[in-house]
Amino acid sequence: MLERSLEVPVVVDLWAEWCGPCKQLSPVLERLAAEGRGTWILAKVDVDANPRIAQAFGVQSIPMVVAVVGGQPLQLFNGALPEPQIRQTIDSMIDQLRDRMPGITAAERTAAEPDSR
């Protein structure tokens, strides 16, 4: 995950099986990641199965979504937000990072090629 975060943002969904809001959020993030076509990557971390990772991110409540950018965590949001708000948060992050992370523009170019559709 850290190595990949040097190229494009890695959005980390910190969740648990028993968490109702987590179950609402996960499909939204998966859909947005697919639409992002490589401009960012989704990683899912079950906090019960990975307590050390949860502790490293400072998880106090779930769902919690952070981005790892250049190996550094960046808090995005907590809770199951409405899809338009999540989309806006991720789009804003991509816009801010586009010039610093060449993997974003490379993914956008690839997605724009006719045979990649």
Write out the residue ranges for each language-model feature:
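A short, hydrophobic beta-strand/beta-hairpin element that forms part of a small beta-sheet core
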Residues: V11-L14, L29, L42, N50-N78
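Non-globular targeting/processing and membrane-anchoring segments
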Residues: L2, Q88-R117
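Conserved redox-active cysteine motifs that mediate thiol-disulfide chemistry
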Residues: L14-V28
